[in-house]
Regions:
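Short helix-capping/linker turns of helical repeat alpha-solenoids
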Residues: 37-40, 58-60, 73, 90-93, ...
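Structural signature of tandem alpha-helical TPR/SEL1-like repeats
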Residues: 41-46, 72-83, 108-116
C-alpha cells in the first residue's frame, strides 16, 4: 500500500502543473495567501467561494480550478469530485485526468475513471503530449481491467496499471533530464 500512496502523491505533484485557467489577480493573491491550506484559512475559504460561484454560473475552468484546489491542494477530496466531474463532462481534459486519479486510487470507481480517460485522451492537445499519452494508456489499461473482471479485481488491476504507467513515464522523464 505504501508504494501505491507514493505513486498517488507523486501524481498529485505532477498534476499541479496541468491546470490551464488564467486566474484573476484577486484569485492569485488568495491562492498565495492560502498556501495550500498552510496559510490564512479565510483566504482559502474565500478562494473556494469565488471559484465555486464561477462553477455554479457555468464557468467550467472555475469548476476545474475549485475541484483541483479542494482535492489536490487542500485535501478535500470528496468535495472536489463534483466540480471535477462537472468540468470533465464539459470536456476539460485536466479535470478528467485528475478525476481519474481519484477514482482509481481513492474511490475504486473504475468505470468512471475509464470514461474520464477516454475524454482526456481525446481532449489533450499536443501541447500536453505527456498527459495525453498517459491518459490514452490508462484508457486502454482500464478497458482491459473492466473486460477481464472475472479473473481479477478491477480495482486492484487498475491501481497496478496506474502505478506501472506512472513509473514508466516517471523513469522516462528522469532519463531525459540526465
Amino acid at each position: 500500500m505504501g508504494k501505491i500512496n507514493f505513486v498517488f502523491y507523486s501524481m498529485i505533484f505532477l498534476a499541479s502543473t496541468v491546470m490551464a485557467g488564467k486566474p484573476t489577480a484577486e484569485e492569485e493573491n488568495l491562492y498565495n495567501e492560502c498556501d495550500k491550506g498552510n496559510g490564512k484559512y479565510s483566504s482559502c475559504t474565500k478562494l473556494i467561494k469565488i471559484l465555486s460561484e464561477k462553477c455554479d454560473s457555468g464557468d467550467m475552468i472555475g469548476c476545474a480550478d475549485v475541484g483541483y484546489i479542494m482535492g489536490f491542494e487542500l485535501g478535500m477530496r470528496e468535495a472536489s469530485v463534483a466540480p471535477l466531474d462537472k468540468s470533465c463532462k464539459a470536456g476539460i481534459a485536466e479535470s478528467c485526468y485528475n478525476l481519474g486519479i481519484f477514482d482509481i486510487m481513492r474511490r475504486g470507481n473504475i468505470e468512471r475513471a475509464f470514461s474520464s480517460y477516454v475524454i482526456a485522451c481525446e481532449r489533450f492537445t499536443d501541447e500536453k503530449k505527456l498527459l495525453k499519452l498517459k491518459s490514452c494508456e490508462l484508457r486502454e489499461a482500464l478497458d482491459g481491467c473492466l473486460r477481464d473482471n472475472k479473473d481479477r479485481d478491477p480495482v486492484k488491476c487498475a491501481r497496478k496499471a496506474y502505478g506501472k504507467i506512472y513509473q514508466e513515464y516517471h523513469e522516462n522523464e528522469n532519463s531525459t533530464k540526465e
